[in-house]
Amino acid sequence: MSGTLILVRHGQSEWNLKNLFTGWRDPGLSELGHEEATSAGRKIKDRGLRPDIAFTSVLSRAKVTNTHILEVLGLPALETIEDVALNERDYGDLSGLNKDDARKKWGEEQVHIWRRSYDIPPPGGESLRDTGARVWPYYLREILPQVLRGKTVLVSAHGNSLRSLAMVLDGLSGEEIVKMEIATGVPIVYRLNPDSTVASKEILEG
């Protein structure tokens, strides 16, 4: 057995609450989001997991989630690396729009295609494939080597950046990954083999 990878989608943001496309915009966590992030920390602690290093995007909702988790674990000064590579998918022209308003403007079917297709981006934005093209190389270069040294690594990021990791770790197709839901504030724990394959996966829902 090698190391452990803990993936956490940030707690609910103010814009999740308002049903807005967020992408690279930078709203804070909602009241529930702060609670979800703290709860994620408790779930990790209850499993006896103790991160050796943390990674997060440069967006505040992920950074604050990471901070809450580390505070619960008694590790407020843990080394944390922030990188734009872990940012949420860029929704381009949809960013900041209410999802219902976007459906009125472009049509329900078109918005559904942009949201749930693997390789069709919204205007000025990224597809899930585009997101994976920056997330996965970063994982291979920066995160995986830490795990293969036997470390426990915490990654606090976003629905689509984490989907991009789960797609490869779980061996999912583009069609399958767009249907995968990643809940806010629910840790996903992967234990990796020395050859970087997945030995086990556990979702800490309880």
UniProtKB/Swiss-Prot annotation:
It catalyses: (2R)-2-phosphoglycerate = (2R)-3-phosphoglycerate. One of its GO terms (molecular function) is phosphoglycerate mutase activity. It is an enzyme of class 5 (isomerase). Substrate binds at residues 9-16, 22-23, 61, 88-91, 99, 115-116, 159-160. Belongs to the phosphoglycerate mutase family. BPG-dependent PGAM subfamily. Catalyzes the interconversion of 2-phosphoglycerate and 3-phosphoglycerate. This is 2,3-bisphosphoglycerate-dependent phosphoglycerate mutase. The lineage of its organism: Bacteria, Pseudomonadati, Pseudomonadota, Alphaproteobacteria, Hyphomicrobiales. The gene is gpmA.
